[in-house]
């Protein structure tokens, strides 16, 4: 089995956040890999990884980083694959990481999700893959139908809650 999604984090300290992406992909049976690579500490390994990802069958890369958050941009500069950046919350509440990821120069785009929004990164990666993979598309559609059903149930439950001045 080849990974369709590659999850890269600057260090294993990002794993508690990125586990949400791993869990979503695993629950939806979308093959993925997880590695720690640092744009600052292992730049050659990052470049080698990024250049070889497409050849290994990877379709989308999710790159998580905090603080200066160079990792997503460095990867995007070295691969033709789409890169999704996940800013990790740190001392500046993730604002530093988010700005580092979204302020890329022309020609080196990085899609960006919210601070610590690893699950959204996994869903976005699956949606990108779903454009050309019907099996993944069906998994995404089924998952979205499931979350819609949860909201419908919540509204039915709320309809049963009684207050004197509640109008619905």
Please provide the spans of the model-predicted regions:
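Active-site nucleophile and cofactor-binding loops and adjacent substrate-binding regions
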Residues: 38-39, 64-68, 87, 112-117
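C-terminal binding/interaction regions
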Residues: 3, 9-16, 20, 95-168
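Short alpha-helical segments enriched in small residues
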Residues: 36, 41-46, 54, 81
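Structural motif
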Residues: 4-7, 32-33, 59-61, 81-84, ...
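Glycine-rich phosphate-binding loop
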Residues: 49-87
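Glycine/small-residue-rich loop that forms an oxyanion/phosphate-binding "nest" at active or ligand-binding sites
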Residues: 78-102, 106
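Glycine-rich phosphate/diphosphate-binding loop of Rossmann-like nucleotide-binding domains
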Residues: 2-41
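Short glycine/serine/threonine-rich phosphate/pyrophosphate-binding segments
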Residues: 14-18, 42-46, 65-74, 92-95, ...
């Amino acid at each position: 089995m080849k990974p369709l999604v590659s999850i890269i984090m600057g260090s294993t300290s990002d794993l508690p956040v990125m586990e949400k992406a791993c869990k979503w992909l695993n629950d939806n049976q979308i093959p993925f890999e997880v590695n720690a690579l640092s744009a600052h500490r292992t730049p050659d390994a990052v470049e080698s990884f990024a250049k070889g990802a497409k050849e290994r069958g990877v379709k989308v890369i999710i790159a998580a980083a905090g603080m200066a958050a160079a990792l997503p941009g460095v990867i995007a500069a070295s691969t033709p694959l789409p890169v999704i950046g996940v800013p990790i919350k740190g001392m500046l509440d993730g604002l530093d990481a988010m700005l580092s990821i979204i302020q890329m120069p022309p020609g080196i785009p990085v899609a960006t999700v919210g601070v610590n929004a690893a699950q959204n990164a996994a869903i976005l990666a699956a949606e990108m893959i779903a454009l050309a993979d019907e099996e993944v598309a069906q998994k995404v559609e089924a998952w979205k139908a499931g979350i819609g059903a949860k909201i419908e149930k919540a509204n039915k439950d709320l309809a049963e809650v009684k207050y004197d001045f509640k109008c619905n």
